């Protein structure tokens, strides 16, 4: 692919803006309570096993920790993004939707799976059974679709920075989010229709209930689980692997391009230069790029001004390289966590749909409880990966809550020494007339 030098600089600048945002938000993975209370309730109630106190205690402890972290983390994300107007970017709008679905998933999944599992009885009634299964499925679906949307948005911002600007707007993001919620509520309508309480007799001859999602036939049950496996795991997983794989490849090529540019700069003293200012170096997610300006600064190449400019260029190049490498590592983590959290529960559901007896025999009780717990973990990991690892978000958090020390408004502070260097550059430029420099942006 051959581009003019001016176009290459513009594309590279846009790409690095997105890399910054990626590192700042650090997505993928999402939550999950598997679609169905029936999973845990069936495995744990249909064939009760002798309870072990230490297993119950460990289960309660782990569920409580994950629940508290999920509620606290997602609530903080929602609060910061709503109250801080400066953080309402396109990607943050998707992250807000992700936090809402994660919070809803946590509230509707964990208590209504853990309590019946411990009591060996679904005590909440038929209406709650239908409602919780419906919101469980919807929250899982919305979370997954949000992750896919974030991966595609990042792909467009990094790999197609010029073309994607047409549709990377807040209004477009809101339309996509509204569509994902409407689609999810529509897809999951079978849950309130076919979820019911099923009575059974426990070992002590007492009658109890379990909340189960039962379709009229085994063929329909198998088709439904296959459908969910495709749209909520396999296809989203493939899309994210491809999108993040292409992003990583693009960034790797950018690293090689930077290395070649650095080598050329050593061999030939440059007469012109441009640099991409980094507002955050932990960036996981890129800001809207500003078209780079081509400045003829021969007059500034002498004395302390030239020395300072050369140091800034070198620092910016190093920051770009570090940011790209961090994004690649972050994307690998996102994909690995997505499959780690989702694969066990979807595999268990598919197994149960096609071989109920064998699945219940091997997964009943503790195994399915901890498989579900693993899927829940993603709802508390998402805020950490996508938000709290983002320097701008942390600054926004401290600005939102007065009780926290506030080092400055988000998006103002950058690398160590960068703010001072930026002021120095502006001061140096102000000493010279615009007749000594070209400020026209390169053609797209």
From Swiss-Prot:
Any one GO molecular function term: cholecystokinin receptor activity
TM spans (from-to): 57-82, 93-119, 131-152, 173-193, 226-249, 330-350, 366-389
InterPro entries reported in the protein's UniProt record: Cholcskin_rcpt, Cholcy_rcpt_A, CholecystokininA_recpt_N, CholecystokininA_recpt_N_sf, GPCR_Rhodpsn, GPCR_Rhodpsn_7TM
Annotated keywords: Cell membrane, Disulfide bond, G-protein coupled receptor, Glycoprotein, Lipoprotein, Membrane, Palmitate, Receptor, Transducer, Transmembrane, Transmembrane helix
Disordered, as annotated region: 263-288
Subcellular location: Cell membrane
Gene Ontology biological-process entries: animal organ regeneration; axonogenesis; cellular response to hormone stimulus; cholecystokinin signaling pathway; eating behavior; feeding behavior; forebrain development; G protein-coupled receptor signaling pathway
Major subcellular site: membrane
Cellular component, GO, one term: plasma membrane
Disulphide bridges: 33-44, 129-211
Family recorded in the similarity comment: Belongs to the G-protein coupled receptor 1 family.
Primary role: Receptor for cholecystokinin. Mediates pancreatic growth and enzyme secretion, smooth muscle contraction of the gall bladder and stomach. Has a 1000-fold higher affinity for CCK rather than for gastrin. It modulates feeding and dopamine-induced behavior in the central and peripheral nervous system. This receptor mediates its action by association with G proteins that activate a phosphatidylinositol-calcium second messenger system.
Protein name: Cholecystokinin receptor type A
Source species: Rattus norvegicus
Lineage summary: Eukaryota, Metazoa, Chordata, Craniata, Vertebrata
């Amino acid at each position: 692919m051959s581009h003019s030098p001016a176009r290459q600089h513009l594309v590279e600048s846009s790409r690095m803006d997105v890399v910054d945002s990626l590192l700042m938000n650090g997505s993928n993975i999402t939550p999950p309570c598997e679609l169905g209370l029936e999973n845990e309730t069936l495995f744990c109630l249909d064939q009760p096993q002798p309870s072990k106190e230490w297993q119950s205690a460990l289960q309660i402890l782990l569920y409580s920790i994950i629940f508290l972290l999920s509620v606290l983390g997602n609530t903080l994300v929602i609060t910061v993004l709503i109250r801080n107007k400066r953080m309402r970017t396109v990607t943050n709008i998707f992250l807000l939707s992700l936090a809402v679905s994660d919070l809803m998933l946590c509230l509707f999944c964990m208590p209504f799976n853990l309590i019946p599992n411990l009591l060996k009885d679904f005590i909440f009634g038929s209406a709650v059974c239908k409602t919780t299964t419906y919101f469980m499925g919807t929250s899982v679906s919305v979370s997954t679709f949000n992750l896919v949307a974030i991966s595609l948005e990042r792909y467009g911002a990094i790999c197609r920075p010029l073309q994607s600007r047409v549709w990377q707007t807040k209004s477009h993001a809101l339309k996509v989010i509204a569509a994902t919620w409407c689609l999810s509520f529509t897809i999951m309508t079978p849950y309130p229709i076919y979820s019911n309480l099923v009575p059974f007799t426990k070992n002590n001859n007492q009658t109890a209930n379990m909340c189960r999602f039962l379709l009229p036939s085994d063929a329909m049950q198998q088709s439904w689980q296959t459908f969910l496996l495709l749209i909520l795991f396999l296809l989203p997983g493939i899309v994210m692997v491809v999108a993040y794989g292409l992003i990583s490849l693009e960034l790797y090529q950018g690293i090689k391009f930077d290395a070649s540019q650095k080598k050329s700069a050593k061999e030939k003293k440059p007469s012109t230069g441009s640099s991409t200012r980094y507002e955050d170096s932990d960036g996981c997610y890129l800001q809207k790029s500003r078209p780079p300006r081509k400045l003829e600064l021969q007059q500034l190449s002498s004395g302390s001004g030239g020395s300072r400019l050369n140091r800034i260029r070198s620092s910016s190049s190093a920051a770009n390289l570090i940011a790209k490498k961090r994004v690649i590592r972050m994307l690998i983590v996102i994909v690995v966590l997505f499959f780690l959290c989702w694969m066990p529960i979807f595999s268990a559901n598919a197994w149960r749909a096609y071989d109920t007896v064998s699945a219940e025999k091997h997964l009943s009780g503790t195994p399915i409880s901890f498989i579900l717990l693993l899927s829940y973990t993603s709802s508390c990991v998402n805020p950490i990966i996508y938000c709290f690892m983002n320097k701008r978000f942390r600054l926004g958090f401290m600005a939102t809550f007065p009780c926290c020390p506030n080092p400055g408004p988000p998006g103002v502070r950058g690398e160590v020494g960068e703010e001072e260097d930026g002021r120095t550059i502006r001061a140096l430029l102000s000493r010279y007339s615009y007749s000594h420099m070209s400020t026209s942006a390169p053609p797209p």
